[in-house]
Amino acid sequence: AAGNLPEDHPRRAEIVTILNKVAKGIKKYQDKKSGLWYQLLDQGSRKGNYLEATASSMFANALLKGVRKGYLHPKYRKTGIKGYRGILKNLIREENDGTISLTRCCAVAGLGGNPYRDGSYE
């Protein structure tokens, strides 16, 4: 989220407004069952799309921190908690050596075929 945004920051209101717009979209595209978010938000469970860890982690963090800091309406807390619980339930794995891994992390993203990406889903 907006981190530690000083009260006297000249663009504070603008940044908080943007965060609220983003939060609305994040809430809209949260997967109802898992609480996570898909790699391509607006494509849902379409073939080839998947519930992705890094965006889900950042979204849950932004919502919860935004509420805690007072940048977001408290209604977003429920969405953030659902995302956090989804991460714990679906994406965290304990390895044989006792370490913890976050699974389903996207290393590279892009749309289109090889060798050039044209922005299409295929």
Spans of model-derived segments:
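Solvent-exposed loop and edge beta-strand segments that line ligand/cofactor-binding
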Residues: A1, E7, R11-I15, Q30, ...
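Structural helix-adjacent loops and short alpha-helical linkers that scaffold large soluble proteins
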Residues: A2-N20, K27, G66-K82
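Catalytic cores of carbohydrate-active enzymes
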Residues: T17, K24, K28-D42, L88-T99
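CBM-like carbohydrate-recognition segments
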Residues: G48-A55, A60-E122
